[in-house]
């Protein structure tokens, strides 16, 4: 586990004041009309860089009035901005069977958020800014994206209520709460600020032989939480068209939700071999999806047993695809292949990702995925060595409008 030595102080640059000055709950919240030109397709190969991003939009109109927990239900057109996400099923392509689809969320439905900030008071490796990160993020979600306070669970180790402490049991319970009863076009949000690390991977599913883990406040007694478990609880149960946005402010968070597609400002860093997964029987085609039958949606992958030798005893484990028909994306500030030395440096950057995300979104709430990735990179570069990564459960058209 890499200890973060100290939290950089944000000084006046952190938009703390701006939170309270905002009268308007939905500044520039809108979906632009479709682009007049066809989307550029520069993403088929890992080697390719991104196409030039479109010009920034001229800003949407302002919003007044709000419904609790739902975003505004009308969107003013913004001319020349990125295209809103398509509403119909999208094919995975790249070797996946015909009919193996995913669906973007319009983020017009219910909104729930889980935010976890751990300073590890009185423990070796105590951190300074994690609870503050969560306060800033929850305020931003509440004021700008219509997440009602009563639809947020906030676990921090400065709270008196034992149920609000970020213990392993409370975190796992809250993860189940977050995804329970989610429907298409809902927008779920997960934020973790605290220690992250790596542990040897037992089921052979990580490229580098390590699983990424997060450390609950009681990890010395209860242990850590592995990326496989977070994926199983928060990604696996989601139907097509449900958005889960995750932001990790921690070391080694590059693949903390075990999402198979990873993008950087340079282009696609990683994508799954879907032809191989299909050959192993991992990609069950969801015919019920084509019929619009949401009930048959839950099992998206046929389990496939794989032998692995551990010492002398051979044991069986289930290998499953990490793709999902849901709309799961994650912003993180570290790479899977970071050496521990890099991680020591990045370790001082706890809070970097959420700070850069909020700062970039405040400057322009109407960006495409690739524009936002570049904006976040620009914000990070003013204070930190880390670079942002955007991971997804499905192939992303990064020229689409980022909605939440």
Curated annotation (Swiss-Prot):
Q: What keywords is this UniProt entry annotated with?
A: Apoptosis, Hydrolase, Protease, Thiol protease, Zymogen
Gene Ontology molecular-function annotations: cysteine-type endopeptidase activity
- Does this UniProt record's set of keywords contain Mitochondrion? no
* InterPro entries according to UniProt: Caspase-like_dom_sf, Metacaspase, Pept_C14_caspase
Q: Which GO terms describe its cellular component?
A: cytoplasm
Q: Does the keyword Protease apply?
A: yes
Q: Where is this region: Disordered?
A: 1-97
Question: Where in the sequence is the active site?
Answer: 195, 251
Any one GO BP annotation for this protein: apoptotic process
* Entry's EC annotation: 3.4.22.-
Q: Which Pfam families match?
A: Peptidase_C14
First-level EC class: hydrolase
Job of this protein = Involved in cell death (apoptosis).
PANTHER family in alphabetical order:
METACASPASE-1, METACASPASE-4
Q: Which family does it belong to?
A: Belongs to the peptidase C14B family.
Would you tell me the protein name for this molecule?
A: Metacaspase-1
Organism source for this protein? Emericella nidulans (strain FGSC A4 / ATCC 38163 / CBS 112.46 / NRRL 194 / M139) (Aspergillus nidulans)
Gene assigned in the entry: casA
């Amino acid at each position: 586990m890499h200890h973060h030595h100290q939290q950089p102080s944000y000084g006046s640059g952190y938009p703390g004041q701006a939170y309270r000055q905002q009268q308007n709950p939905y500044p520039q919240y809108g979906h632009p009309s479709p682009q007049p030109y066809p989307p550029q397709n520069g993403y088929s190969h890992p080697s390719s860089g991104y196409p030039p991003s479109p010009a920034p939009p001229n800003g949407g109109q302002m919003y007044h009035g709000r419904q609790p927990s739902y975003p505004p239900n009308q969107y003013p057109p913004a001319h020349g901005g990125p295209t809103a996400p398509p509403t119909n099923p999208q094919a995975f392509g790249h070797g996946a069977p015909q009919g193996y689809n995913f669906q973007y969320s319009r983020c017009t439905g219910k909104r729930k958020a889980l935010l976890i900030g751990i300073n590890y008071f009185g423990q070796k490796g105590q951190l300074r800014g994690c609870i503050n990160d969560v306060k800033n993020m929850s305020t931003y979600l509440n004021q700008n994206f219509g997440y009602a306070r009563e639809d947020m669970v906030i676990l921090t180790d400065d709270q008196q209520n034992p149920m609000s402490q970020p213990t392993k049991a409370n975190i796992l319970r809250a993860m189940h709460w977050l995804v329970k009863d989610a429907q298409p076009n809902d927008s779920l949000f997960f934020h973790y600020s605290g220690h992250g690390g790596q542990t040897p991977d037992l089921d052979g599913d990580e490229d580098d032989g390590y699983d990424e883990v997060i450390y609950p406040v009681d990890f010395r007694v209860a242990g850590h939480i592995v990326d496989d478990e977070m994926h199983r609880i928060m990604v696996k149960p989601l139907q097509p068209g449900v958005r889960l946005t995750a932001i990790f402010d921690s070391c080694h968070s590059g693949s903390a939700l075990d999402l198979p597609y990873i993008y950087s400002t340079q282009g696609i860093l990683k994508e799954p071999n879907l032809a191989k997964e299909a050959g192993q029987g991992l990609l069950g085609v969801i015919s019920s999806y084509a019929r619009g039958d949401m009930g048959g949606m839950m099992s998206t992958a046929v389990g496939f047993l794989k032998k692995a030798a551990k010492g002398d005893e051979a044991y069986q484990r289930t290998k499953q695809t990490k793709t999902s028909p849901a709309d799961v994306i994650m912003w993180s500030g570290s790479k899977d292949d970071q050496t521990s030395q890099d991680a020591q440096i990045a370790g001082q950057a706890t809070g970097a990702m959420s700070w850069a995300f909020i700062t970039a979104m405040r400057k322009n709430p109407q960006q495409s995925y690739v524009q936002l990735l570049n904006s976040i990179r620009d914000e990070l570069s003013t204070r930190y060595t880390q670079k942002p990564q955007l991971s997804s459960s499905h192939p992303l058209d990064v020229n689409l409008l980022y909605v939440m």
